[in-house]
Curated annotation (Swiss-Prot):
This is Basic phospholipase A2 acanthin-2. GO terms for cellular component: extracellular region. Ca(2+) binds at Y28, G30, G32, D49. It catalyses: a 1,2-diacyl-sn-glycero-3-phosphocholine + H2O = a 1-acyl-sn-glycero-3-phosphocholine + a fatty acid + H(+). The active site is at H48, D92. SMART domains: PA2c (SM00085). Snake venom phospholipase A2 (PLA2) that potently inhibits ADP-(IC(50)=12 nM) and collagen-induced (IC(50)=4 nM) platelet aggregation when tested on human whole blood. PLA2 catalyzes the calcium-dependent hydrolysis of the 2-acyl groups in 3-sn-phosphoglycerides. It comes from Acanthophis antarcticus (Common death adder). PANTHER family: PHOSPHOLIPASE A2 FAMILY MEMBER (PTHR11716), PHOSPHOLIPASE A2-ALPHA (PTHR11716:SF47). Keywords: Calcium, Disulfide bond, Hemostasis impairing toxin, Hydrolase, Lipid degradation, Lipid metabolism, Metal-binding, Platelet aggregation inhibiting toxin, Secreted, Toxin.
Length: 118
């Protein structure tokens, strides 16, 4: 679920940046998304959005699905047994790892309503 996703983000970036820093970033980080991703981090969010879309097609409620995971050496590791839990956990873990590798550009905060995301 989204709370667990926040924990995964903290795990992968070693606590360097709060998950809240990603809520209003670029065109895809946060609720919804449109247009072309503005950078690598925004692309991570677009991929995560698409992954959640696939989870919804499988009738897995990705924003609310609870799963089992642990932080092992700054890497989120999924331990879920059910198909839905595993799928959603994998979406979140992949995004958290992607976020940790991508540069963070403060100029891309709050641009969602601008023409760059049309």
């Amino acid at each position: 679920n989204l709370y667990q996703f926040g924990g995964m983000i903290q795990c992968a970036n070693k606590g360097a940046r709060s998950w809240l820093s990603y809520v209003n970033y670029g065109c895809y980080c946060g609720w919804g998304g449109s247009g072309t991703p503005v950078d690598e981090l925004d692309r991570c969010c677009q991929i995560h959005d698409n992954c959640y879309g696939e989870a919804e097609k499988k009738r897995c409620g990705p924003k609310m699905t609870l799963y089992s995971w642990e932080c092992a050496n700054d890497v989120p590791v999924c331990n879920s047994k059910s198909a839905c839990e595993g799928f959603v956990c994998d979406c979140d873990a992949a995004a958290a790892k992607c976020f940790a590798k991508a540069p963070y550009n403060k100029n891309n905060i709050g641009i969602g309503s601008k023409t760059r995301c049309q």
